[in-house]
Amino acid sequence: MNTLEPTIVWNHFYEITQIPRPSKKEDKVRAYLDEFGKKHNLTTVTDKAGNVLITKPATPGYENEKTIILQAHMDMVCEKNSDVEHNFDTDPIQVIVDNGWIKAKGTTLGADNGIGMALMLAVLS
């Protein structure tokens, strides 16, 4: 995936695909987002429902402009081909690039909404 542009987005997406995140089991991806916020000196809050809010101060000179809010969900649809052994609770997604298309080997990719999270992390980086 190193050849895909913009690199920062695809690097974040790949990292997210390596974190098991079935519905109702988002703790690992939640921890990843929290660590990302800390690493980038951003305010990160998790509410009682498990939603993660990461805030970034305005760029200098834009403090009085309207706020922008980006949203994505953390879990993924967990489906696999009948001939594939994969545990969505523990196994990372096997990502492949095929003629410029990003795919998963025998499972769902988790692009809904992993790519949304990746784009937001790129904006926050």
Model segments located where?
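Mixed-charge, polar/low-complexity N-terminal
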Residues: 3-5, 33, 77, 83-84
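A non-catalytic alpha/beta surface segment that caps or lines the substrate-entry region
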Residues: 22-66
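Active-site metal-coordination/substrate-binding segment of hydrolases
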Residues: 62-125
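Short glycine-centered, acidic/aromatic-flanked micro-motifs in structured strand/loop junctions
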Residues: 19-21, 56, 72, 106
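Predominant activation on well-ordered alpha-helical scaffold segments within soluble catalytic domains
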Residues: 10, 14, 34, 117-124
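Structural signal for hydrophobic packing residues in well-ordered secondary-structure cores
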Residues: 14-17, 37, 41, 78
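N-terminal capping segment at the start of a domain
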Residues: 1-24
